[in-house]
Amino acid sequence: AMLMAAFVGPFSPIFLFWPVLYDIFQEIGIEKGEKYPTIMLILVAIATLLGFPVPPYSGNSLALIGNYAGITENMGSKVIINNAAYLAVALVYGFVSIAVIVLFCKYVLRPDVSKLKNLDVEMLKRNPLPPLNGNQKFMAVSFVIYILTMLLPSMLPKLKIMQFLSVNNYGIALGYTALLCCVSLDKEKHEPVLPFGKVLNGFAWGTFFLCTAAILLGSVLTNESTGISAFLNTILRPVFSSMSLVMFYVALLVITLLLTNICNSLVVGMLMQPVIASFCLSSGINSAPITSLIIIFVLASASVTPSASPFAAMIHGNKEWLKSGEIYKYTMMFAVIELVLVIAVGIPFATALIR
């Protein structure tokens, strides 16, 4: 589910795995409201959230990374986060979080899984997926190549070809989209790999315009002429100046966890960035590691309240299978685990990898 959310589509795991789980629960006699199905359905959403911030070249991650570059440029010292290093940190944090949360569920929450003994593996084969057609194979191969063109410039920045790719990444994205709209390997329907009309109808325009508006607003609010950066620096510098670097990181992560589950995660990410930039730039601290962690954590931990993220809203909207009290109980537990892990694993790993 995490990898699917990262590289296929952020909502795909929930739309795919929840119906599969419903069928399995019905087949083996698990009732609504039992502990095991409640935890499993929430875990699918948690894994989806952990995969959501992974790709630095799309979605809210791209919006926040680009916004921070604009903020720091307005402050006189542009900070560009390395895409490959960011991706590595996000993947490691996601895998570790899933492993620890699953172990926590197994040995601490201990739901009754005895009915799983009645599961017939053949049931899962009743509706097999059809083989990939030419368009789907082309999409799979070309998408891997596209991801590499986005990440390799961060890994090999001194090569001239990589410098060319880095400067022209928007052109590459447009060219790749145009290629998908023109190529057709479908021998039956003769549709292009990317049917542009259908994609336009299904595109998340609301999220797109929200990201666009947030980036523009963030650049305006952090411009030197507004005085907001100077104000934040004046207010927060006395608070953070007495802290060690690690304690500064921990304080920011705790504040982020609280805010992202009250407000929208993207908005909170935008609000935290001027604070980080103001303090780090004035103190001579490399802000790339903590900024990367904040971006990953603010998007991944937004699970407790419906306003935190669309994924949290989907959890709370599943009234048929999930009760509000159970949702708050388990998501708060998982959020605390994620906080502990981002401090214990994320901080040292990001500090070592992101320069």
Which residues does each PLM region occupy?
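Membrane-interfacial loop-to-helix junctions in multi-pass transporters
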Residues: 1, 28-42, 134-137, 170, ...
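Hydrophobic transmembrane alpha-helices that form the pore/transport pathway of multi-pass ion
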Residues: 1-53, 57-75, 265-297
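Hydrophobic alpha-helical segments of integral membrane proteins
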Residues: 17, 21-24, 28, 46, ...
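Alpha-helical transmembrane segments and their membrane-interface exit regions
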Residues: 21-27, 177-182, 301-302
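Alpha-helical transmembrane segments
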Residues: 27-39, 111-128, 187-196, 309-327
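Membrane-interface segments at the starts/ends of alpha-helical transmembrane spans
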Residues: 75-89, 163, 238-242
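Hydrophobic transmembrane alpha-helices of multi-pass small-molecule transporters
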Residues: 85-234, 333-339, 343-355
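C-terminal transmembrane helix pair
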Residues: 86-94, 209-217, 221, 225, ...
